[in-house]
UniProtKB/Swiss-Prot annotation:
Gene Ontology cellular component list: plasma membrane; proton-transporting ATP synthase complex
Main location: membrane
Organism: Rhodopseudomonas palustris (strain BisB18)
Protein name: ATP synthase subunit b 2
Job description of the protein: F(1)F(0) ATP synthase produces ATP from ADP in the presence of a proton or sodium gradient. F-type ATPases consist of two structural domains, F(1) containing the extramembraneous catalytic core and F(0) containing the membrane proton channel, linked together by a central stalk and a peripheral stalk. During catalysis, ATP synthesis in the catalytic domain of F(1) is coupled via a rotary mechanism of the central stalk subunits to proton translocation.
Transmembrane segment boundaries: 37-57
Length: 188
């Protein structure tokens, strides 16, 4: 094998020390410990500076933005909730006013229709009263006409009956008196 890659015992140049002993783990070697500690300190300081100056401000700004956005969203939600509550109150107020107006319009319409129907009823009653009076006059006139015709018919019938039964022609004046007396008795 090539030099530095190992020997027959499997030891390598990196791990074998003089005298055939294995060398300690490189970070624990006494002669390189101080330089490794300085390197660690430099790396830690560099990492600390990078993290504190670059990474943490970015993370902090993201967290601040997120917190601000949450606060803004919460404030907007509160504002919108207030607006929706106000809108709901306004809607309920408008609805109550609309109901009141509808009831007032309904009552007014009902009163107007009742008044109109009452006026129409009175007008119809007056017309019916006039027609009834006219009908009563017509009936009275028809009755008088009929009664005058009845008197004539009764006189003719009585004359015919007397003539049929007795064979004599009755006296007109006596017949008229008898018919008048009979008709007056039936009207009373």
């Amino acid at each position: 094998m090539a030099e530095g890659h190992g020997d027959a015992n499997g030891a390598t140049a990196h791990t074998a020390a003089d005298g055939g002993h294995k060398a300690p783990f490189p970070p624990f070697q006494k002669d390189t410990f101080a330089s490794q500690l300085v390197s660690l300190l430099i790396a830690f300081v560099a990492l600390y500076l990078i993290v504190s100056k670059i990474a943490l401000p970015r993370v902090g700004s993201v967290l601040d933005e997120r917190a601000k956005r949450i606060e803004d969203d919460f404030a907007a939600a509160q504002r919108l909730k207030g607006e929706s509550d106000d809108a709901l109150k306004a809607y309920e107020t408008e609805l109550a006013q609309a109901r009141a107006r509808a009831q007032a319009i309904g009552a007014e319409t009902r009163e107007r229709l009742n008044a109109a129907s009452e006026a129409e009823r009175k007008s119809l009653e007056e017309k019916l009263a006039v027609k009834l009076a006219e009908a009563e006059k017509t009936i009275a006139a028809t009755r008088e006409t009929a009664m005058s015709n009845v008197r004539g018919i009764a006189a003719d019938a009585a004359a015919a009956i007397v003539q049929q039964l007795s064979g004599l022609v009755p006296d007109g004046k006596a017949l008229d008196r008898a018919v008048d007396a009979t008709l007056k008795g039936s009207q009373a």
